[in-house]
Amino acid sequence: MARSTGKDAQALFHSLRSAYAATPTTLKIIDLYVGFAVFTALIQVVYMAIVGSFPFNSFLSGVLSCVGTAVLAVCLRIQVNKDNKEFKDLPPERAFADFVLCNLVLHLVIMNFLG
Amino acid sequence: MVNDGTFYFDEKLVNMREQQGPLATTSSVVRGLTAFSSVITESLNLTGDKILGIAKFFLGIGIPGDTKNFFDQVDSLACLENNRVSIPLILSLPSTVISLTKKDSLKVKVNTVLGSHAPPLTVTLVRAFSSSARDNSIIENQELKFDPQDAVYFLDDLPASFDVGEYIFVFKMLVQDSEQQTVYATGTLTQVPIYVTGLIKIENAKIAVLDSDLGSVETQKKLDLAGESTVSVSANHLQKLRLSFQMSTPLGNAFKPHQAFLRLRHETKVEHTFVVGSSGKKFEITLDFLGLVEKFFYLSGRYDIQLTVGDAVMENSLLRDIGYVELDLPEPPENASRPPPQPVDPYTRYGPKAEITHIFRAPEKRPPQELSLAFLVLTILPLFGFIIGLLRLGVNLKNFPTSAVPATFAVIFHLGIAAVLLLYVLFWLKLDLFTTLKTLCFLGVFLMVVGHRTLSHLASASAKLKSA
């Protein structure tokens, strides 16, 4: 039984990889961006775990900037994805403009909270 | 006429504006009297007592406050000094204290009002009696001898029965030349209070601690009140403290001083004072601590003992710390009264206080700088990973518009975003929110315009591509 689950997991993984290769490049860029943001957040959490959370507001602002920008990127991905029926009429440039604007606002707040 | 032998005139309150006091009134009477008597040939019928009374009034008021009164006083005395009615003679004593130890003699001076010499007189001490026993006169009719060098009348030795105390001496003066007796006013009798002082013998002084129930002596120590030595005793609240001594005059009589106090002072400066009672020559005070426990506020510890014995006629009055007593009192109950607060030295109360140094909050433990820098580098790494990933994906920059106008807009768009991010960095470093928001407004509006242009251009380009 374990061997079959192991084999199933591998098969699942392979199919996932092949399916992913079919996604358009733009979406891959956005995915990469999300990964980068999350990874940065993780590194900050590890740092805080090591040295303690003395300027807690700084830690929060750092992590939240990463998480916020990841969330905005995910929203962008949803809006830009052509397979998504809901946002068919929304031009991708408009979505990108929203993404940029929201990021700027987010980063203003983050900079204020950074201290 | 007043009881102390002075005599003066006062004015009836007729006119408020022109009111003069008794001094001015009497002096104007004297001036008139002496001026009148100097011009008439007959003598005025005036008793010497009245003139003497007026003279004593002027001499008895001290030095008046204002110049007019002072002038009146001196002028009247000058009139009286040499007037034709009768010249008053004043008897005075240079010292009213006679010390038995120094063997002082009684000295008496007789002068006119302004201090000039009197004619030869016979001064007699009529009576001398103790102020406490007025009927019993010790000296009677003793004539005083005259010392021409100092111009004093003196009495050489006082009789042996003169003990210390307060006395009243009564003198009488008589002008030796009988013809001149009407010229001078000597008065009848003059009373003078005299103090006779001497060394009082204090002996047999002892301090003892007694057992309260039986009255038996537990410790007894001799005191040397004349010297400097101190004693120390200890007692608890079940015992009594007894201090006793004997006092006698130089002649051996019993002596009751004006002040005989015993004071106990605690380390905390709380004091208690007691009067030493006497019977004849024996002075004794017993402090029963059982009854005094509450009065002493239940304070145990070391009490300094101070004895005070004094009187005006005692030449060896003493105020001395004679030692201390270690007192052991029980614990105070709940509702015992607290001792009264002792006066605080005003310099310590209003003086500078201890300096307060502010203790700052200990700063938080910061990580070592190398660790922080390492993690900074680690955090930047994902960015590079992102860029590398982008390149690997083969991101195309082909869609970047090449024609002039849209290109500029695209470039300006990217520059605009970079400018906003730079503004944020400046905001973190040194700007405040208000300037940042103001600048952001301008930049934001600018960016929106440019962005709209660029993106709409891109959108139209992709739409053209789609439709084509």
UniProtKB/Swiss-Prot annotation, chain A:
Residue spans, topological domain Lumenal: 53-55
Mode of membrane association: Multi-pass membrane protein
Chain ranges passing through the membrane: 32-52, 56-76, 95-115
Gene Ontology biological process terms, A to Z: protein N-linked glycosylation
Membrane topology (Cytoplasmic): 1-31, 77-94
GO cellular component: oligosaccharyltransferase complex
Cell compartment(s), UniProt: Endoplasmic reticulum membrane
Principal subcellular localization: endoplasmic reticulum
Pfam family, one: DAD
Functional pathway: Protein modification; protein glycosylation
Keyword Transmembrane carried by entry: yes
Keyword annotations of the record: Apoptosis, Endoplasmic reticulum, Membrane, Transmembrane, Transmembrane helix
Top-level taxon of the source organism: Eukaryota
Assembly: Component of the oligosaccharyltransferase (OST) complex.
Family that this chain belongs to: Belongs to the DAD/OST2 family.
Function: Subunit of the oligosaccharyl transferase (OST) complex that catalyzes the initial transfer of a defined glycan (Glc(3)Man(9)GlcNAc(2) in eukaryotes) from the lipid carrier dolichol-pyrophosphate to an asparagine residue within an Asn-X-Ser/Thr consensus motif in nascent polypeptide chains, the first step in protein N-glycosylation. N-glycosylation occurs cotranslationally and the complex associates with the Sec61 complex at the channel-forming translocon complex that mediates protein translocation across the endoplasmic reticulum (ER). All subunits are required for a maximal enzyme activity.
Entry-linked PANTHER family: DOLICHYL-DIPHOSPHOOLIGOSACCHARIDE--PROTEIN GLYCOSYLTRANSFERASE SUBUNIT DAD1
Protein name: Dolichyl-diphosphooligosaccharide--protein glycosyltransferase subunit DAD1
